A protein has these predicted regions:
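Conserved nucleotide-sugar phosphate-binding/catalytic loop shared by glycosyltransferases and other
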Residues: 2-12, 31-82, 310
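Donor-nucleotide binding loops and adjacent catalytic segments primarily
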Residues: 42, 47-49, 170-179, 183-262, ...
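Conserved donor-binding/catalytic loop of nucleotide-activated donor transferases
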Residues: 115, 255-258, 273-282, 301
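A short, well-ordered alpha-helix in the C-terminal region of glycosyltransferases
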Residues: 330-344
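C-terminal alpha-helical cap of glycosyltransferases
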Residues: 343-363
Length: 363
């Protein structure tokens, strides 16, 4: 295998596993030419070049579930995007195409099929999206992140995640993490994060309960996202309430924390469970409920709590979170339960499948 094309983007849910897989392939094949395929409107336009990989852009093809004008425009958009993707394939000449779902994947799957190229499909969520349901019908090489995902020919690889997270030793980095964010080295610590875009519900409910958290001696590291806003008065002499818009070193944030309040995207679930961080999952209430399904294996194992978005109020936070952070034995039990649920070597397992597909040739 000399060249590979990795297709995915839009959100961190597609881009992060793509980059983790690219890194795994580069480690085992230092001379491999890796090209990424995305659209002009997603996070990939900044994240992929920053990681040092070439990025080709094609027009996005949103797949509407509703019978509306967008659905009627889909065939024309798809034909145009497939033509653009075919031109990319002809320039790059990859030996295999790997897709991670999202707006760019359907044209990538169809173009790979037309050029008789081996295809690998990776599904990040417990509930497969439309693009990957199509892609899985075009290849034998299908990987999933969660055991309950239903796709033809699927093998469970887990979700590819960053090496700095997969290899994280939280106790060893705890002191460094707390110093890095200006936290007290000894106080129980709550991490709040809504993912790459932040989360209005999490931001509002936790910040509104800051008084109860401070009364319980709980300090907070709150990652509010690029557009988030919170108003918290720092109590003189009280536990720190640290607000960050974005955290590049999430390994230090996870190490600093005793528990996390978060959404339940596949990256977040895999990372917090993999590092053994007790979680309060508040799934995003859109789509087909895939975030709740993502969290279910960790919750069923005892490693997390699942709270509906509408139920995650300041009153809920006051009633439950200080007590959780004040119970070291419960936190330790949740950490042990979470740590064994999600594979941490999804990048290497998926790289194995890419090698296999490239070696077998078409499909």
């Amino acid at each position: 295998m000399r060249r590979v094309l990795l297709a995915g983007g839009g959100t961190a849910g597609h881009t992060s596993p793509l980059l983790a897989t690219a890194d795994a392939l580069r480690r085992r094949h230092p001379s491999l030419e890796i090209t990424c395929l995305g659209t002009p409107r997603g996070l990939e336009t900044t994240l992929i070049p920053a990681a040092g990989y070439p990025l080709e852009l094609v027009s996005p093809v949103p797949l509407s579930r509703a019978l509306d004008a967008d659905l009627l425009r889909t065939p024309g958009r798809l034909r145009a995007s497939v033509r653009e993707t075919l031109a990319v394939l002809d320039r790059v000449q990859p030996d295999v195409v790997v897709g991670f779902g999202g707006y760019v994947s359907v044209p990538a799957y169809l173009a790979a099929r037309r050029r008789h190229l081996p295809l690998v499909v990776h599904e990040g969520n417990a509930l497969a999206g439309i693009a990957n349901k199509l892609g899985a019908r075009l290849t034998r090489h299908v990987a999933t992140s969660f055991p309950a995902t239903r796709l033809p020919h699927a093998v469970l690889t887990g979700l590819p995640i960053r090496r700095m997270i997969a290899t994280l030793d939280r106790p060893a980095l705890r002191s460094e993490g707390r110093v890095a964010f200006g936290l007290d080295p000894d106080l129980p610590t709550l991490l709040v994060t809504g993912g790459s875009q932040g989360a209005l519900r999490l931001n509002g409910s936790v910040s509104a309960a800051a008084d109860a958290l401070a009364d319980a001696g709980v300090q907070v590291l709150h990652v509010i996202g690029p557009k988030g806003e919170v108003q918290v008065e720092q109590r003189p002499g009280g536990p720190p309430y640290v607000v960050e818009r974005y955290v590049d070193r999430m390994d230090l944030a996870y190490a600093a924390a005793d528990a996390v309040v978060c959404r339940a995207g596949s990256n977040t679930v895999t990372e917090v469970a993999g590092v053994g961080l007790p979680a309060v999952f508040v799934p995003l209430p859109i789509g087909n409920g895939e975030q709740a399904l993502n969290a279910r294996p960790v919750v069923d194992a005892g490693g997390g709590l699942l709270v509906a978005d509408a139920a995650f109020t300041p009153e809920w936070v006051r009633a439950h979170v200080p007590a959780l952070l004040g119970d070291p034995e419960r936190l330790a039990a949740m950490a042990r339960a979470a740590a064994g649920v999600m594979p941490l070597d999804g990048d290497e397992r998926l790289a194995d499948l890419v090698d296999l597909a490239a070696g077998e040739g078409v499909r």
